[in-house]
Amino acid sequence: MEIIIISGHSGAGKSVALRCLEDIGYYCVDNLPLDLLPQLASILSTNQQSVAISLDIRNLPHSSKTLENLLTEVQQQHQIKLIFLDADRGTLIRRYSDSRRLHPLSTQDLSLEAAIDAERKYLDPLTQHADLIIDTTRLSTHELAERLRDFLCEKSDKALKIIFQSFGFKYGLPLDADYVFDVRFLPNPHWIPELRPLTGLDAPVAEFLNKQNEVNHFIYLTRNYIETWLPMLEQNNRSYLTIAIGCTGGKHRSVYITEQLGEYFQAKGKNVQIQHKSLAKHKKANTQ
């Protein structure tokens, strides 16, 4: 089992890092007492492949030797990577001032600045065990997430899932759509009696639409639009991209075009899912 340990200075972005790892498929545990790590690893190894835990100064052992012994014990059976997050003193002070949260070491006798300095002195030995040290001083949350993704090299897990979704405007817009394309202006198989009971998944409808220059031109332009901006969307730290194609009833045109777009990007090696939101309504109506 792979275990990622996220540690570092309070205010450096451990919570952001843990959310990122959760988004790419890690089972995450926040602020685990390090003494419980061997027990947790034993329990989770039966049904988890990738686990991430965050540690702050309150959960670390009092000596670096104890930490080293614990990590060595767990490494005998599992693959461990320690990621340490850092930021400069001024940035940590500003982040705490902006959030108005209390530093873990702050007491009535210890100011925020003194608490940050004390934590830095305590955590310095931990950096010697780190597989990766990230300075988040000038990083946005998206940039931090991308650094983590690149380090973990989980290309298949981090791949953006593109959902191509057909729907009927008569049933309303899909609430989860990032982009909506309206194809109600294209030639409609509904007005051809022999095609009316069929759907965009059926060969006669596909053959009819494939003969329409307007349909092919729309697919070409839409495909190019998506290809143009997809690299930026893939770098934008998102897990899903939902592209909805709508016609009047979600039965013919939108279904065919959704299939064409989805199959094209699947052939390009993208992580694609094809959905037809309104087809079930037509099938249900036909059985009644």
From Swiss-Prot:
The family this protein is said to belong to: Belongs to the RapZ-like family.
Reported function: Displays ATPase and GTPase activities.
Gene3D superfamilies, A to Z: P-loop containing nucleotide triphosphate hydrolases (3.40.50.300)
Keywords: ATP-binding, GTP-binding, Nucleotide-binding
PANTHER family tied to this protein: RNASE ADAPTER PROTEIN RAPZ (PTHR30448:SF0)
Protein name: Nucleotide-binding protein PM0169
Keyword Nucleotide-binding: yes
GO-annotated molecular function: ATP binding; GTP binding
Membrane-traversing stretches: none
InterPro entries cross-referenced by the UniProt entry: P-loop_NTPase, RapZ-like, RapZ-like_N, RapZ_C
Binding site residues for GTP: 56-59
One Pfam family hit: RapZ-like_N
Residues the record lists as binding ATP: 8-15
Species assigned in the record: Pasteurella multocida (strain Pm70)
HAMAP family xrefs: RapZ_like (MF_00636)
